[in-house]
Amino acid sequence: MNKRAMLGAIGLAFGLMAWPFGASAKEKSMVWNEQWKTPSFVSGSLLKGEDAPEELVYRYLDQEKNTFQLGGQARERLSLIGKQTDELGHTVMRFEQRYRGIPVYGAVLVAHVNDGELSSLSGTLIPNLDKRTLKTEAAISIQQAEMIAKQDVADAVTKERPAAEEGKPTRLVIYPDGETPRLAYEVNVRFLTPVPGNWIYMIDAADGKVLNKWNQMDEAKPGGGQPVAGTSTVGVGRGVLGDQKYINTTYSSYYGYYYLQDNTRGSGIFTYDGRNRTVLPGSLWADGDNQFFASYDAAAVDAHYYAGVVYDYYKNVHGRLSYDGSNAAIRSTVHYGRGYNNAFWNGSQMVYGDGDGQTFLPFSGGIDVVGHELTHAVTDYTAGLVYQNESGAINEAMSDIFGTLVEFYANRNPDWEIGEDIYTPGIAGDALRSMSDPAKYGDPDHYSKRYTGTQDNGGVHTNSGIINKAAYLLSQGGVHYGVSVTGIGRDKMGKIFYRALVYYLTPTSNFSQLRAACVQAAADLYGSTSQEVNSVKQAFNAVGVY
């Protein structure tokens, strides 16, 4: 949640254009990837048949082999990695591109089949790999690649060798490095000290060169921490801003304490005391009388209460059970570190710093902050957006959008500002970002003003302002850069962006792909000729995203 994360990165950028496709432009449309000269979003009545849904996808790609340029049979180039039925009854499948059995990094295709008809394909596949002679055996070992990544972290980030934790297993991938795909190791270096980090490295498997690196802070591995057996009760306490809240707790007759353990939602909501250390998760919060009014309790009261609000929002509005869709437990640690000016999702739990009292109050005191960070978890379990460049900016925008919608859902002094409750307590009216007016805090509100440098992972906290503005306009309407947008309200805006995130976006999606995904999501929900579809187009036109 840094206002500006000053992190260097080299990016993957995709330029796209929209074109009519196939025999009937009225029925089919395409978003074209200018870098790879292949489609990245195709929609319409693509293919009908009685085959299994995945067979329709393979058959269509083979039929359009000159367009997608996969080379060979599609079933030999793609591996089905996920299949589900969405709330509209569509079969949604995710495929990962492979080269001689090796995953192609970020090359994920999402397909929708409804009533025996293939209706859309989204995602960027790398063409003509069969025409390249790519190495499939590494010249350096996994251990060497990991040592190179850890040493680079020490040299460039922490200035000392970090106490690395177990991360995602290192794997070989085909990495689309600019115009030259190559064999690389994907290495994950996670650590909590001296500063938290969750770095992804692409290490050339031939010579150990660092091809790319970025900090995916919303993932890391926590320690233990066990729930208690007991009776569900309701406690009361005061939050960071002094407001009283009733919270679900658990009484353990064995220990004689009340714990911040909510057994009424999914697999539970658990809140821990970090005790100003950097070891996670800390101790499950305990209290002797079920009243949490001490000043030290405030951050825990808010973290616990707001986690429940976020759970309720996703369940009641979108039918989603916890961040993973399968009722995963929600764990939060407060009082992390001393005066720590940050909050982050670490792949398994939420972590909240106390702030320094001047720049930030305790981060759990902002309901939109809690909603923002837990939405990173939703993104991790759905689109898996790479936290760099435009895909990273979409990642951040989704968290801002749904953090704000959670705030409106709870009706707790809602507005279109981000982090206003906990940022610069001595300055009235200040915030981290604004969705209604991104330029208010120096963020771009139009694609022509986007940041194109390498800091902040390629501007993930900056360029998110472009998408935030589009979402605001879609909800509230208005005129922006001479483009008039008819608002459709917060609820419909949220449903469109949620459907785009969960059922259409892929790890390397960019702004143009997001536009196409939102248009298709609106068509799914409200009809292809609806005002909602027109408003989506207007909103993205207004911010210069086509």
Swiss-Prot record:
Classification lineage: Bacteria, Bacillati, Bacillota, Bacilli, Bacillales
Family statement drawn from the similarity comment of this UniProt entry: Belongs to the peptidase M4 family.
Gene source species: Alicyclobacillus acidocaldarius subsp. acidocaldarius
TM segment ranges: none
Binding site for Ca(2+) 4: Y423, T424, I427, D430
Keyword ATP-binding: no
Signal peptide: 1-25
Annotated EC: 3.4.24.27
Gene3D superfamilies linked: 3.10.170.10, 3.10.450.40, 3.10.450.490, Neutral Protease Domain 2
Enzyme's top EC category: hydrolase
GO molecular function: metal ion binding; metalloendopeptidase activity
Binding, Ca(2+) 2: D368, E407, D415, E417, E420
Record field: temperature dependence: Thermostable.
Protein localization: Secreted
Record GO cellular component, one term: extracellular region
UniProtKB keywords: Calcium, Hydrolase, Metal-binding, Metalloprotease, Protease, Secreted, Signal, Zinc, Zymogen
Record-linked InterPro entries: FTP_domain, PepSY, Peptidase_M4, Peptidase_M4/M1_CTD_sf, Peptidase_M4_C_domain, Peptidase_M4_domain, Zinc_Metalloprotease_M4
Name of protein: Thermolysin
